[in-house]
């Protein structure tokens, strides 16, 4: 099993995401492909959290709207078939509906971690839609189902190994897997992250 990690710049434009698809489909070995959020997304999500922490909901809303507009343009360049474009639009609507809902919720650090997770969740779902459009067989593995940190915020490798192996055994017919970098669950089972660069 080979692990291939692609950062935000590698998937930051539709043509780069398409190049990643070509790279990961060469050779016969099984691969787990780990993707970051599209470049600029995590910075925008951090800014949303900072604005909400200061009580500046109009600024948070402005950043959300600008980011959503960017994603709407992105998928139109990435996805060409009506079916996968519809799927891509549904992904964007799901995650930006969440970001708009949080404007009405009391802000706290746990909510901030949920905000920060949205970038990787979107990038991998959109990439999966592109692979599907190209007829590339794969499985999308949610990192939140197996990536875990301990009480010291360090990767809990034993738990990760057991959970990931269990998931892979459910997909013995697949040789290509896509998952998220950066995001994980903490020792309380809450959405958390490995900090910037931590997924490397």
Residue map of PLM features:
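Nucleotide/pyrophosphate-binding catalytic subdomain
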Residues: 1-200
